Amino acid sequence: MTLQPASGARDLNPQQVRKNHLIASKLSSLYQLWGYERISPPHIERLDTLTAAGGISNNEILKIVSDEPLGLRPEITASIVRAASTRFNEYERPLRFWSAGTSFKCNQSIDGGIDIEESFQSGVELIGTKAINAEIELLSLLIESLEVIEIDQKYKMTLLIGNTYLLELILSSFDSTKIDQIKKILSDLDYIALTTLDVKEEQRMFIKTIMNMRGKPEKVLTNLQNIYGSNSYIDKLEELFTIIEPLAKEKGIEVQLDPTLGTKYKLYSGLTFSLVSSSTSAPVTIAKGGRYDDLVKKFSSSAQNCYGIGFSISVDKVRELVSTSKEKLVNNVKVLIAYKQSANLYKALKQQKELHRKGIISVISHEPLKTIDETNQLLKTNRCNKIEWID
């Protein structure tokens, strides 16, 4: 019998579980203050639901053996959009939903096998409005989310913003047979692959210019306007940045416009964004989101209000960035209730109930304690930092 978890899966220890719960609890309280209501879609969905917008590859889905094609959700958005278009179809728009749960994704390992990527996510979806104010609302909520989960200040946070339609405009001058190849080069910032790309030299230099363009929104927008002139996508981004950039700056978050960002997330159509944190090794993407109007259209029976935008935060990744000094538990006292005679067990249970009523964690010794060594060992075993004796 194999005693290890499946490849890619992992066991979380009590401290990791506690921190996950604390982060998710803080986020859920914030979402509710913003008027979002909890929804809990199933972990198992039909494959046509999970692959509806083409944003998720069939190879990334962990399949379920059944009479119909089913799989574990690799992300939560598609399931919520399906629910919004069916069970909540008659509800007035916009719909504001939040969710928290586990998603599963398949990755191919080096040896050709399958690795299961299991992640705990928390996020929101705003469905049924196309206003730019909806995008501003979501980005503002994401910025405020960082404040409530209290990431260690030693980590630098960067909010990257892009637009898939802007990317399409940039790529429109290239041969359609080269588009996917160029997207991959842009996504990977692969300068080596760019040198071997079969395009004219001026086109190669243009791609390199776009790859190097990410930076301060005002500067990037000016560069784009010099190339394309007045454009609705550029104008909307300019309007968005006038509000979001000052809000982010107040929280110590750098905002950058990345024209290549749309290459990374196929689920989105329109605004895309990701929140990246510095770390001790490589940058870590802790949240991502964007517009997914095309996904809503796939599920909707009506052509009206087919709009959606949302984001998800990786609680597992955030957990590693939260300052341990700011991990605020309700009560960090843990009491061992001890007794020397079995006849005092009833009194010990009554004392435990009283401590629980006060919100104090307490455990009872299962045996009478006779010596100091026994007592100290039990304190250590139960990870208690205080003892109460029942005489």
Swiss-Prot record:
Keywords: Amino-acid biosynthesis, Cytoplasm, Histidine biosynthesis. It is found in: Cytoplasm. It holds the Pfam family tRNA-synt_His. Its main location: cytoplasm. GO terms for cellular component: cytoplasm. GO terms for biological process: histidyl-tRNA aminoacylation; L-histidine biosynthetic process. Disulfide bonds: none annotated. This function is generally fulfilled by the C-terminal part of HisG, which is missing in some bacteria such as this one. Belongs to the class-II aminoacyl-tRNA synthetase family. HisZ subfamily. Required for the first step of histidine biosynthesis. May allow the feedback regulation of ATP phosphoribosyltransferase activity by histidine. This is ATP phosphoribosyltransferase regulatory subunit. It comes from Prochlorococcus marinus (strain NATL2A).
